[in-house]
Amino acid sequence: MTSINDTRARAVADLAERLVLASVDVAAAPERVFHALASKEITEWWVRPGVFDTREWTGDVRRGGRWRASGMTRGEPYVQEGEFLEVDSPKRLVHTWERAGNPGVVSTVTYLLEPVDGRTRVTLRHLGFASRDMCGAFAIGWETSLERLAEILAPEFLLDHR
């Protein structure tokens, strides 16, 4: 059995398929995790220190709704955006991902949330990178971000279960 504070995420990049698979077990209910994945709370966990920092997020969380995130990456501003393809709270969230101003380069992010031993296992699948290098970099970024998500939600879980 893992500790409540064990927030290690794992990510692997399949460079040939241009696919990232990542997972983390979060000490929180699926409903709470889903909210963190689909709200402005993204600005708290969607970070990789020294590489990127998400500062703003907006979204219309419904099938066909749009989302937009902005921040800084290596000292330069960035904007990511996409469309929600599936919204099945608190089990599954699927959206497209593209850098604003870079039409035609669209990838897809799928989050699956499963209750496991009083926690929520988040499994992420990000498919459709423009290059192998980008795929490899995103594997590191997703691992860092999912670890941060688990770290942020663990203290809430401990408070709720005293």
Regions found by a protein language model. Give the residues of each.
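Hydrophobic/aromatic beta-strand elements that line small-molecule binding cavities or substrate pockets
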Residues: 24, 57, 80-85, 97, ...
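Short, highly charged C-terminal tails/helix-capping segments
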Residues: 151-162
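K/E-rich alpha-helical interaction surfaces of small helical-bundle regulatory domains
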Residues: 32-35, 39-44, 139-152
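Hydrophobic ligand-binding cavity/cleft-lining segments
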Residues: 1-53
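Short, conserved beta-turn/loop elements at beta-strand boundaries and strand-helix junctions
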Residues: 88-93
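A generic structural micro-feature
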Residues: 14-16, 74-78, 102-105
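Beta-strand/loop substructures that line and gate deep hydrophobic ligand-binding cavities in soluble
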Residues: 94-144, 161
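Short beta-edge strand/loop motif at the mouth of beta-sheet-based domains
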Residues: 21, 41-77, 161-162
